Regions:
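Short linker/helix segments within small regulatory modules
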Residues: 122-131
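Cys/His-rich microdomains that often coordinate metals
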Residues: 115-119, 138-141
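Short, charged early-sequence alpha-helical segments and their helix-coil boundaries
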Residues: 43-84
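Short terminal alpha-helical segments
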Residues: 1-36
């Protein structure tokens, strides 16, 4: 259950998003969410912020990531925000998921395991390669199509990583 201050904070977030023009690009949307987050961060639980990796997404240097290639639209976010989170944890997860959709490049490639379209491009820091992860089942493969057993050190793929991999 969310306390009154958190419910009010979520309502402010919904209102802020509702005031953004539908033709606004993803970079401006990201900056609006980022500014709201920095303003409201003190109201959120640090352990939940850390647990769900919110800081990694909200603190990116936007010029290094493919936000302009994001398929996440303001309309998608507005539809998503019509639902009220039942807890602070849910609110932070939703915020993280919105930022993820804006920051991580989504590729329309069919997963060879579950056969769904849509994989996320991420970076294997140990092997220094971009890999694709299915957004539905989590199956991973290299950009060349080779299956990968496990990846331990994952980070967001930058524009440079994606260019070298031939994805942008």
């Amino acid at each position: 259950m969310m306390n009154k201050a958190l419910r009010s904070t979520w309502q402010e977030f919904q209102y802020m998003i509702s005031q953004i023009n539908n033709k606004t690009n993803q970079i401006i949307i990201f900056k609006c969410i980022q500014n709201w987050y920095f303003d409201k961060k003190k109201l959120l639980s640090l352990h939940l912020i850390e647990e769900f990796g919110l800081e990694e997404l909200v603190n990116i240097d936007i010029k290094n990531y493919p936000l302009e290639k994001s398929e996440c639209t303001l309309e998608d976010i507005k539809r998503f925000l019509k639902i009220q989170p039942c807890s602070e944890e849910c609110m932070i997860v939703w915020l993280r998921d919105i930022l993820w959709e804006l920051v991580v490049l989504s590729i329309d490639i069919k997963c060879e395991y579950c056969f769904k379209l849509e994989m996320s491009a991420l970076f294997d820091a140990d092997n220094e390669i971009v890999f694709l992860e299915c957004n539905h089942c989590g199956w991973v493969k290299t950009v060349d199509g080779c299956s990968i057993e496990s990846i331990k050190n994952i980070r967001l793929a930058t524009n440079q990583d994606l260019k070298l991999a031939g994805l942008i």
